[in-house]
Amino acid sequence: MAWNTNLRGRLPITCLILQVTMVVLFGVFVRYDIQADAHWWLEKKRKNISSDVENEFYYRYPSFQDVHAMVFVGFGFLMTFLQRYGFSAVGFNFLLAAFGIQWALLMQGWFHYFEEGHIVLSVENIIQADFCVASSCVAFGAVLGKVSPMQLLIMTFFQVTLFTVNEFILLNLIEAKDAGGSMTIHTFGAYFGLTVTWILYRKNLDQSKQRQSSVYHSDLFAMIGTLFLWIYWPSFNSASSFHGDAQHRAALNTYLSLAASVLTTVTVSSIVHKKGKLDMVHIQNATLAGGVGVGTAAEMMLTPYGALIVGFFCGIFSTLGFAYLTPFLESRHRIQDTCGIHNLHGIPGIIGGIVGAVTAAYSSPDVYGEPGIVHSFGFGSYKMDWNKRMQGRSQIFGLLLSLAMALVGGIIVGFILKLPFWGQAADENCFEDSIYWEVHEEVNTVYIPEDLAHKHSTSLVPAMPLVLPTTSASIVPPVPPTPPVSLATSAPSAALVH
């Protein structure tokens, strides 16, 4: 089937409509939170606050910076491993995230921050919006190289909407805990993306197989994304936790789990290769699995060695998934997972949900202290019949809800994206930047060996024929090529002696 990939009319109109809609909705609904409003000084005076340091901004903004870098730099560069799709990986990730955070601020504002007819906007909102968009970036990895920017915008719109509904039910109605988003961000994002790519299955994708691989420099760029994500993941898992011990504990648990997953990833990567070599795909991705797996239980009393155990197993399962499960799913179940998000986010996300359920179910006042367990899980006087076993069940229900929302939502959105007018590329043109980007090809250069008698002459010339400014090319005698010069001796070659 021939596809029309010229987006000159469709993409600008879509972006313009979406942005104008955002402006109108923000104008109607969004207002500054009191701590971001010019009336903050009156609030300080009323509450007898003497310092601006009490403003929530100073507690939350460092975490926001780290999460923001993960979304735009970490996820963006992690997907630059494809040899001809670097522009699209970073650029389309930038596009969907920029739109997604605006829509997420509205959606989450209506569900969580709606006061007196308006959404109150603070630094906490933008952290939550980045979390929401991180789920969209995860799903993007499954369809990378196979969808148009139009499809990505539509997918982001629906995914942000479904994410917010799922998160509200899970956190506010079921009352599950998910500080680092193993269930709401990673499990939901991964299986939503996998379901979409299953619906969008391309039977002739093998025609683009030569571009569905990396080269030396593209793997290095992807490793930049890995390092950004690895360094900032403790902030990601702790950004929304309560100040104090919970946030402190979340950062420590994530730090340890990430470290453990690196060593087990290297171990398994070497084992599965016949010559014991390491696969860069494993190192770029599976080394991050510990951060995903510890997310739900990050702020719980998981213990340091428990965090190491989680990272240990996440690294193993993630690497084995890249080695064996991804090819199996593509060949047998028509799931074309470009980035292997099932192994980095899906499987570790499920592990994280289970770890959170077990940790919650075995929590006790002996470990947390009586005030600590009330503070961590909300076992208070208003929920006298609530106990740790019920919390464990809530965690499992939350995991199942995320899976169900992802699968059902992915099927619906997948069929919407399958419509033929979104400007998607043909099977033979997938994983190619030049379909949607102006790509300036490099001018190759050739090396002409230096004539030792004329050391001042240049050695690099353009790899194109030299045309002299004459009135007729026919009067220019052909110039014989300069024979190579041996550099083994300082004497000129005999061929150059007249």
Swiss-Prot record:
Q: Where in the cell is it found?
A: Apical cell membrane
Membrane topology reported for the UniProt record: Multi-pass membrane protein
Query: Which coarse location class describes where this protein primarily resides?
Result: membrane
Decide whether keyword Signal is in the record.
no
Task: Pull the Cytoplasmic topological domain ranges from the record.
Answer: 1-9, 83-86, 146-153, 201-219, 273-279, 326-340, 417-498
Q: Which domain of life is it from?
A: Eukaryota
Q: Which GO terms describe its cellular component?
A: apical plasma membrane; basolateral plasma membrane; plasma membrane
Q: Which residues are glycosylated?
A: 48
Alphabetically, the GO molecular function entries are: ammonium channel activity; ankyrin binding; carbon dioxide transmembrane transporter activity; identical protein binding
Signal sequence range: none
TM spans (from-to):
10-30, 62-82, 87-107, 125-145, 154-174, 180-200, 220-240, 252-272, 280-302, 305-325, 341-361, 396-416
- UniProt family annotation: Belongs to the ammonium transporter (TC 2.A.49) family. Rh subfamily.
Function comment: Ammonium transporter involved in the maintenance of acid-base homeostasis. Transports ammonium and its related derivative methylammonium across the plasma membrane of epithelial cells likely contributing to renal transepithelial ammonia transport and ammonia metabolism. Postulated to primarily mediate an electroneutral bidirectional transport of NH3 ammonia species according to a mechanism that implies interaction of an NH4(+) ion with acidic residues of the pore entry followed by dissociation of NH4(+) into NH3 and H(+).
Quaternary organization: Homotrimer.
Q: What is this protein called?
A: Ammonium transporter Rh type C
| Organism name | Mus musculus (Mouse)
List the lineage, top down: Eukaryota, Metazoa, Chordata, Craniata, Vertebrata
